[in-house]
Amino acid sequence: MRTDFNDILLDAYNANPSSMESALTFFAGSDNENAKPSGLVSILGDMGELGTYASAAHDEILNRAIDSGVEVLTVGPLFSSSASTQASVKAFDTTSDLISFLKANPMVGKQVLLKGSRSIALEKAIIAL
């Protein structure tokens, strides 16, 4: 979808390590040939229902996102914990916190991936993009 300022790829209904990996690969890969790396932003919301694997899964996906070379923002306590040692990542506890940041720091001319579990409600951030 396209807002007045950015192009948005929204997948905020379901997220698991496999779907996150696929989304990041597509988004940052050669399939996205019209975008420059500096114009790509991944906004990743926590993945729900992972049990004891949750922390490790969020660490793995965050590292994959960082390695892809795109700007990374995260939402939710699991990604916030993973991002605490990553200076290049902006982490937010809630989608409301993300929206406040985006309103104060507008993005223009970006291609934005919004990917996370339903419980994070990342679609609400579209209003600030």
Where do the PLM segments sit?
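ATP-dependent carboxylate-amine ligase
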Residues: 1-129
